[in-house]
């Protein structure tokens, strides 16, 4: 049952990510901004050929090599730790986010980013980035609370 739940979460995460990215591309000009919540959040359409804070900009080969490795390792750990809820949640979200951005990189050579925080200087990000970030936080909690790793 958990395998099916993991698959559903991954598919829903990818669909949400890809549908929203497509909406942004269709409705916002590249570089333009639409205010969503004044002084808090806006949508700014950018093409990101790197990672957060423009690290590895223009290094698509790095992501095209690294992402499948991360996915294989995450899938292996998901299989091994399926019964442990924190690992299950974290790894499932990481896989969904990694696949969402990987699909962009393979198809377009860049990732569509759109969420811009207005109240702090933070990189523009997307739904896949949110899934990855939350997944890594949950995985970190899983590792810290795992009695087997102590």
Swiss-Prot record:
Substrates-to-products reaction catalysed: Release of signal peptides from bacterial membrane prolipoproteins. Hydrolyzes -Xaa-Yaa-Zaa-|-(S,diacylglyceryl)Cys-, in which Xaa is hydrophobic (preferably Leu), and Yaa (Ala or Ser) and Zaa (Gly or Ala) have small, neutral side chains
Subcellular location as annotated: Cell membrane
UniProt keyword annotation of Zinc present: no
TM stretches of this protein: 5-25, 59-79, 82-102, 124-144
Cystine pairings recorded for this chain: none
Assigned keywords, A-Z: Aspartyl protease, Cell membrane, Hydrolase, Membrane, Protease, Transmembrane, Transmembrane helix
Coiled-coil ranges from the UniProt annotation: none
Superkingdom to which the source organism belongs: Bacteria
GO biological process terms held by the UniProt record: proteolysis
EC number: 3.4.23.36
Membrane topology designation: Multi-pass membrane protein
Active site: 113, 129
Pathway(s) of this molecule: Protein modification; lipoprotein biosynthesis (signal peptide cleavage)
Signal peptide: none
GO CC term, one of those recorded: plasma membrane
GO MF term set: aspartic-type endopeptidase activity
One Pfam family hit: Peptidase_A8
HAMAP family: LspA
Assigned protein family: Belongs to the peptidase A8 family.
Function: This protein specifically catalyzes the removal of signal peptides from prolipoproteins.
Name of this protein: Lipoprotein signal peptidase
Organism expressing this protein natively: Lactococcus lactis subsp. cremoris (strain SK11)
Lineage of origin: Bacteria, Bacillati, Bacillota, Bacilli, Lactobacillales
